[in-house]
């Protein structure tokens, strides 16, 4: 057969070299070990000590690079609920209820979820509070679902009133168009009450009476502007 002439395109020359195939790019992948899952790179390194996004999901990795299962505390002190499928978000139950942000970080203090106010108690590890809870010196009431009570009465032996902010009322307070009086413990008073050198009468419902009041054969006049 005819030999190709020098310079023939069929024969590789320095001016027309055959390009080698480029090497496959280094990739990272999930690798399962006895200790759990780790996200490893081809160069022998892996993710560790934090929360990172992999494939559109956020995962926690401990100091050895493994995905923990359960509560994980990041180096900055933030808590996450870690699973093999990524960190949890939203409401999470582990004995008590906890609230996790969109990034998975546990939140504490007053939080609004679904239009309802909740208190995640930092003194209880972030657990959702229920019942009577004192925050910065003020008493609040959270129902069994954790929702803060506001502008409503709560009965716990005595009657207590929670204002619009959720704070328990003490002293004189107005609910609707009616005046009431609660002692220092927040318990609604009834009957005669002395305050500031004046006497006031509170009916069985706790409402302050005004005008003429008859008790047995005795009549008393309670000023409409102040009781």
Task: Report residues per predicted region.
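Extracellular adhesion/carbohydrate-binding repeat motifs centered on closely spaced tryptophans
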Residues: 1-227
